[in-house]
Design a protein with these regions (language model features):
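Residue(s) in the substrate-gating loop at a strand-loop-helix junction
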Residues: 145
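Substrate-binding pocket helix/loop in short-chain dehydrogenase/reductase
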Residues: 101-114, 210, 214
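Active-site helix of classical SDR
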Residues: 125, 161
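Alpha-helical segment proximal to the catalytic Tyr-Lys
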Residues: 130, 174-175, 242
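Conserved glycine-rich cofactor-binding loop
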Residues: 9, 16-18
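Short, small/polar-rich loop/turn modules that mediate ligand/substrate recognition or access, typified
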Residues: 177, 182, 244-246
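C-terminal substrate-recognition "lid" of short-chain dehydrogenase/reductases
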Residues: 222-251, 256
Length: 257
């Protein structure tokens, strides 16, 4: 299916590895021009160079910066538009933050978990909406988690912030819909990639236990891949999903009940 992303400008926060990188590659494969951002300059530049070889340097723009910071986000989106033209799509993929199990979570860790997961998504969405709504066109995608769809025993800050992201998606969709700007969300399940949590689980001392758990809990009996999230993301961002907004889409191999 041709998704109609040729020449569209997509901004992806958290793009140097894993899910974010999978989304970038899917959008590039559909002909989009993609701005990629992440905090780690070295990893970001390595991926920019690799992707430029495959898709052309003229369709990539990279900026290392903290996508939790309002001014950094605003400046990055402004520079993206100066480089490529009007923003069509924005992907908020900044997430995770270390949090101990249980309820003994100090205020600093609690606040940091929400800043990392929820606030980063809100601030990028706001920056994108400021540009998209006057033009009457655009598509925003938040990357949440199935941890936000139910109590799965994840760290309190993570699951709670992701649940708030799911709600944010629906509220922003109602606000922006009359301006022809769509806001959707993907809730990934157990996605495996180099350096990620599930790679550590699948290769660590409890790898056999985790393998049994996956077979028991996931009807497709396996982990997902960044490419599979990328495929769903490219569709949701694209004009082909023109009647989808406010949707929280699990991509989890059937794990959520």
């Amino acid at each position: 299916m041709h998704l109609g992303l040729d020449g569209k400008v997509i901004f992806v926060a958290g793009a140097s590895r894993g899910i974010g990188l999978g989304i970038v590659e899917a959008c590039l494969a559909e002909g989009a021009k993609v701005a990629i951002t992440a905090r780690g300059a070295e990893a970001l530049e390595a991926e920019r160079a690799r992707l430029a070889e495959a898709y052309g340097a003229d369709r990539l723009w990279a900026l290392a910066g903290d996508m939790r910071d309002t001014q950094v986000i605003e400046d990055a989106v402004t520079r993206c538009e100066a480089e490529f033209g009007p923003l069509f799509g924005a992907v908020a993929n900044v997430g995770l933050y270390p949090c101990p199990p249980g309820f003994e979570v100090d205020d600093e860790t609690w606040d940091a978990g929400f800043t990392q997961n929820l606030d980063s998504a809100w601030r990028l969405s706001r920056a994108a909406l400021r540009r998209m709504t006057p033009r009457g066109d655009g598509s925003i995608l938040l990357i949440s988690s199935i941890a936000g769809l139910g109590a799965l025993g994840t760290a309190l800050t993570y699951g709670t912030a992701k649940a708030a992201m799911n709600h944010l998606t629906k509220e922003l969709a109602r606000i922006a819909g009359s301006k022809n700007v769509r806001v959707n969300c993907i809730a990934p399940g157990n996605i495996i990639f180099p350096g990620g949590t599930w790679e550590a689980n699948s290769t660590g001392p409890r790898a056999d236990n985790w393998a049994r758990w996956i077979r028991r809990e996931v009807p497709l009996n396996r982990y997902g891949s960044p490419e599979e999230i990328g495929a769903a993301a490219a569709f949701l961002l694209s004009p082909k999903a023109s009647f989808m907004t406010g949707a929280v889409v699990p991509v989890d191999g059937g794990q959520t009940r």
